[in-house]
Amino acid sequence: MLYIFRLIVTVIYSILVCVFGSIYCLFSPRNPKHVATFGHMFGRLAPLFGLKVECRKPADAENYGNAIYIANHQNNYDMVTAANIVQPPTVTVGKKSLLWIPFFGQLYWLTGNLLIDRNNRAKAHSTIAAVVNHFKKRRISIWMFPEGTRSRGRGLLPFKTGAFHAAIAAGVPIIPVCVSNTSNKVNLNRLNNGLVIVEMLPPVDVSEYGKDQVRELAAHCRALMEQKIAELDKEVAEREATGKV
């Protein structure tokens, strides 16, 4: 019964946000500030799923300039966990096929997110150039999932290099965002599904990395994130075991 209730409320809420959000965005289409606004709105679904989301970020995070945010990509619950920490004006890079999801796809495009064709390598490379161009023209940040796909309980997957190519070419820092494990954590028939911690790490300076050191930069960032995620998972387990959620 709880499962059905959650499903109905989620569908109704999501459709309302997407429909009225799309209408709202028509007054200033493709404005990158919209992404954080509606990301946080989807983040409000976390309590409905029985999740307590705890966000941590550096004190001066709101003053960061242009940057590329990278986060671990686990499952669809990223929409209600990681979305809570998105800073304006940040846009995401997603698959072109997202555009065809009813209601959501239209909002995704109108909020200013970038769409890439993963099946066309040439177009994917041109997207990196477009990202760099965006940085040169305006104050904007980009959010990317360097794993390229949902990990679904397989741990932190190997990183693709697109985000790191773009960061070096644009001369902007990389800001890792780490989310504690959510794989097999949510049971929609269970009232309380525990704690999820989302932590933003300090910026990684890319100025010391050349174009031929992209993989080194990717490996460095992945190591930072892997260590932090392990720490967060340990903390979550300890707090849930002692009831200090």
Curated annotation (Swiss-Prot):
Chief location of this protein within or outside the cell: membrane
Extent of motif HXXXXD motif: 73-78
Single GO BP term: CDP-diacylglycerol biosynthetic process
GO molecular function: 1-acylglycerol-3-phosphate O-acyltransferase activity
Organism: Salmonella typhimurium (strain LT2 / SGSC1412 / ATCC 700720)
Annotated metabolic or biological route of this protein: Phospholipid metabolism; CDP-diacylglycerol biosynthesis; CDP-diacylglycerol from sn-glycerol 3-phosphate: step 2/3
Cysteine pairs bridged by disulfides in the record: none
InterPro entries: AGP_acyltrans, Plipid/glycerol_acylTrfase
A GO cellular component annotation in the UniProt record: plasma membrane
Reactions performed catalytically: a 1-acyl-sn-glycero-3-phosphate + an acyl-CoA = a 1,2-diacyl-sn-glycero-3-phosphate + CoA
UniProt protein name: 1-acyl-sn-glycerol-3-phosphate acyltransferase
UniProt key word Cell membrane: yes
Topology of the protein relative to the lipid bilayer: Peripheral membrane protein
Family label: Belongs to the 1-acyl-sn-glycerol-3-phosphate acyltransferase family.
Free-text note on domains in this protein's UniProt record: The HXXXXD motif is essential for acyltransferase activity and may constitute the binding site for the phosphate moiety of the glycerol-3-phosphate.
UniProt xrefs under Pfam families: Acyltransferase
Functional description taken from the UniProt entry: Converts lysophosphatidic acid (LPA) into phosphatidic acid by incorporating an acyl moiety at the 2 position. This enzyme can utilize either acyl-CoA or acyl-acyl-carrier-protein as the fatty acyl donor.
Subcellular location: Cell inner membrane
Gene for this chain: plsC
Enzyme Commission identifier(s): 2.3.1.51
